[in-house]
Amino acid sequence: MVNSDYSLYLVTDRSLLQGRSLLEEVRKAVKGGVSMVQLREKEAGSREFYELAQTLQTELRELGVPLLINDRLDIALAVDADGLHLGQDDLPLPVARSLLGKEKIIGLSINKREEAREGEKMGADYLGVSPVFSTPTKADAPPATGLEFLASLRQEIKIPLVAIGGINKENLKMIKETGADGAAVISALMGASDIEGEARKLRQIWERN
């Protein structure tokens, strides 16, 4: 399997870039310390999504950083992405695994303990615990799970846990203290005017706690 460092996990959102280049901003984020990237494109058509994914995959492979595709198995296959991230209403994980193979990373979003248990049982490589805090980037997000839920999951679930939802410089230390393997960040990076600098600050917080 490809290198699976979930510690600082960037989830893209082009709507926060205010016209800036996605490729350039992702490149800066990686330079600042991002260890994994998920391309999340809810509005793009298939061709645009494919072209973005292809460009990012070429760039990130050279940098040694895995690219995961949100939801779209066809895009993940088409660009030979390093993995796929699935939600509870997306394609069933075992089906995705049968098509992607054992070497690819497959993550699953969970919001409940039973979903976490089922995800681990089905062979997810990691679980995205979402949202840990209330988040501005997902209007239809379920209620925040909170830190206690994340910490309690860590006591039960053996596969990596990645926290997502409302994570920033002010609360990243608390995420690390739960025993989570990583933090997925959207607006704290994608909305930053200096994405490299912000990524470096987040990386420093993670490393020293």
Swiss-Prot record:
It comes from the Bacteria. Mg(2+) binds at residues 71, 90. GO terms for molecular function: magnesium ion binding; thiamine-phosphate diphosphorylase activity. Keywords: Magnesium, Metal-binding, Thiamine biosynthesis, Transferase. Pathway: Cofactor biosynthesis; thiamine diphosphate biosynthesis; thiamine phosphate from 4-amino-2-methyl-5-diphosphomethylpyrimidine and 4-methyl-5-(2-phosphoethyl)-thiazole: step 1/1. Its EC number is 2.5.1.3. One of its GO terms (biological process) is thiamine diphosphate biosynthetic process. Condenses 4-methyl-5-(beta-hydroxyethyl)thiazole monophosphate (THZ-P) and 2-methyl-4-amino-5-hydroxymethyl pyrimidine pyrophosphate (HMP-PP) to form thiamine monophosphate (TMP). One of its GO terms (cellular component) is cytoplasm. The gene is thiE. It catalyses: 2-[(2R,5Z)-2-carboxy-4-methylthiazol-5(2H)-ylidene]ethyl phosphate + 4-amino-2-methyl-5-(diphosphooxymethyl)pyrimidine + 2 H(+) = thiamine phosphate + CO2 + diphosphate; 2-(2-carboxy-4-methylthiazol-5-yl)ethyl phosphate + 4-amino-2-methyl-5-(diphosphooxymethyl)pyrimidine + 2 H(+) = thiamine phosphate + CO2 + diphosphate; 4-methyl-5-(2-phosphooxyethyl)-thiazole + 4-amino-2-methyl-5-(diphosphooxymethyl)pyrimidine + H(+) = thiamine phosphate + diphosphate. Belongs to the thiamine-phosphate synthase family. InterPro entries: Aldolase_TIM, ThiamineP_synth_sf, ThiamineP_synth_TenI, TMP_synthase. 2-[(2R,5Z)-2-carboxy-4-methylthiazol-5(2H)-ylidene]ethyl phosphate binds at residues 135-137, 166, 186-187. Its cofactor is Mg(2+). Binds 1 Mg(2+) ion per subunit. HAMAP family: TMP_synthase. CDD domains: TMP_TenI. It is an enzyme of class 2 (transferase). This is Thiamine-phosphate synthase. 4-amino-2-methyl-5-(diphosphooxymethyl)pyrimidine binds at residues 38-42, 70, 109, 138.
